[in-house]
UniProtKB/Swiss-Prot annotation:
Keywords: ATP-binding, Cytoplasm, Ligase, Nucleotide-binding, RNA-binding, tRNA processing, tRNA-binding
Gene it is expressed from: tmcAL
PANTHER family in UniProt: TRNA(MET) CYTIDINE ACETATE LIGASE
Species per Swiss-Prot/TrEMBL record: Lactobacillus gasseri (strain ATCC 33323 / DSM 20243 / BCRC 14619 / CIP 102991 / JCM 1131 / KCTC 3163 / NCIMB 11718 / NCTC 13722 / AM63)
Protein's name in the database: tRNA(Met) cytidine acetate ligase
Signal sequence residues: none
Similarity field: Belongs to the TmcAL family.
GO molecular function, one term: ATP binding
InterPro entries listed in its UniProt record: Rossmann-like_a/b/a_fold, tRNA(Met)_cyd_acetate_ligase
Subcellular locations according to the entry: Cytoplasm
Entry-linked Gene3D superfamilies: HUPs
Functional summary from the UniProt entry: Catalyzes the formation of N(4)-acetylcytidine (ac(4)C) at the wobble position of elongator tRNA(Met), using acetate and ATP as substrates. First activates an acetate ion to form acetyladenylate (Ac-AMP) and then transfers the acetyl group to tRNA to form ac(4)C34.
BP-aspect Gene Ontology terms: tRNA modification
Gene Ontology CC annotation, any one: cytoplasm
Catalysis performed (reactions): cytidine(34) in elongator tRNA(Met) + acetate + ATP = N(4)-acetylcytidine(34) in elongator tRNA(Met) + AMP + diphosphate
Length: 385
């Protein structure tokens, strides 16, 4: 039996995500599809626009059989850590086939993963502080293997391939060409499939008139979006971030995960006069750091995620089961006793005391305050029949 895996954020779930699930199902009609999905915070350092339970339900309604939460400790990270965590967890759950969307599905990603893993580690110790790490990495990959990977989904795809090739048994990779708008398109396009970025932007600017989104969303998802009273975004959170930076000492800021090279001084210096989050990012931006890297740092700061806490979380890695259907339930019964990765179906004080789940539950407290609904305690996996 083949087991299909997909790494996702679904922020929010749209027709492009449904297309990828359909492509996976065409290849393997009766085998389980497992989704490893980011929770209430996503890779580029922001809150998800819908909570993890609603997004998991959308995936199940569109063909996924099991949806697990990728812990915050891996979800809000650069591509290599994000990919490494998600691929290892999927592999542990028995996944043998990985489906992912890319701009160019003709590349041999397994070959790229093998070649990049052969590059000596000291060749990746980039020292050019006038360029971002991502830029230097992409230039190195282009130089070593002859392919540029400067588009967001291509970068993630290569990271998946690198992580897969580090497994004892690498996954079979199935790249699927993305349809419709580009990953970062800001505005809705006259296409069947829009970018998640454009959909989020539309929600923020037209919260009381979302009917325009209907053609870009699977059945039922427009109604779910319309029910929301709040669409989380950094403008909502900026005053909390401002208070956090202004009230924290330099020593406290220095302890934050990924705080480096004197960024605590720059944040302290610029936060007081910043009018909004966008202007603050511009003020602390340098050639060394991408905006995504700085957004993640701001999120770690807002949530008070320290280096010590992040590293401690990796000593006890688990995943929260968000939902399943009958095929997913049957597969889970079959593998549960043999899987090393702890699968959490119910959050309680004991399992939420430490590890990735402990950090996840703690940072979700802010999301709960914004959205007004519990995200962990008292919640059980969604069952779709």
């Amino acid at each position: 039996m083949s087991v299909i895996g997909i790494v996702a954020e679904y922020n929010p779930f749209h027709s492009g995500h449904e297309f990828l699930l359909n492509q996976a199902r065409l290849v393997s009609e009766n085998d389980p599809i497992i989704v490893m999905m980011s929770g209430n915070y996503v890779q580029r350092g922001q809150m998800a626009i819908m909570d993890k339970w609603q997004r998991a339900k959308a995936a199940l309604n569109s063909g996924a059989d099991l949806v697990f939460e990728l812990p915050f400790s891996f979800a809000v990270q650069p591509a290599d850590i994000f990919a490494n965590g998600s691929i290892r967890m999927l592999s542990n759950l028995g996944v043998s086939e990985l489906f992912f969307g890319v701009e160019d599905a003709n590349l041999n990603f397994s070959y790229l993963g093998q070649k990049i893993n052969q590059i000596p580690k000291n060749r990746m110790d980039f020292r050019d502080y006038t360029q971002t790490y991502a830029t230097q990495y992409n230039e190195m990959v282009a130089r070593e293997v002859g392919h540029e990977v400067n588009q967001p989904n291509m970068m993630l795809a290569v990271a998946y391939a690198v992580a897969s090739e580090q497994l004892d048994t690498p996954l079979h990779l199935h790249p699927v060409t993305r349809l419709g708008s580009g990953h970062d398109d800001q505005l809705l396009q006259d296409k069947i499939i829009s970018s998640a970025t454009a959909i989020r932007n539309y929600c923020l600017h037209h919260p009381n008139d979302l009917i325009e989104l209907k053609k870009y969303l699977p059945k039922g998802e427009l109604a779910a979006l319309e029910k929301q009273k709040v669409y989380p975004n950094w403008n909502l959170l900026f005053n909390f971030l401002k208070y956090r930076i202004e009230s924290a000492s330099l020593e406290e800021l220095r302890s934050i995960y990924q705080m480096s090279e004197g960024l605590e001084y720059k944040m302290k210096e610029e936060i007081h006069n910043a009018e909004d989050f966008t202007s603050f990012l511009r003020q602390i931006k340098s050639k060394r750091y991408t905006y995504a890297r700085l957004r993640r740092l701001c999120l770690y700061t807002l949530l008070n995620v320290t280096e010590k806490e992040m590293q401690a979380s990796y000593q006890d890695v688990s995943t929260l089961l968000l939902g399943y259907n009958s095929r997913g339930r049957n597969y889970l019964k079959k593998i549960r006793k043999d899987v090393e990765l702890p699968i959490i179906s119910k959050v309680d004080k004991k399992n939420a005391a430490s590890g990735t789940l402990g950090l996840q539950v703690r940072v979700d407290r802010l999301f709960e305050q914004i959205m007004g609904e519990d995200q962990n305690f008292g919640r059980r996996p969604i069952e779709v029949k």
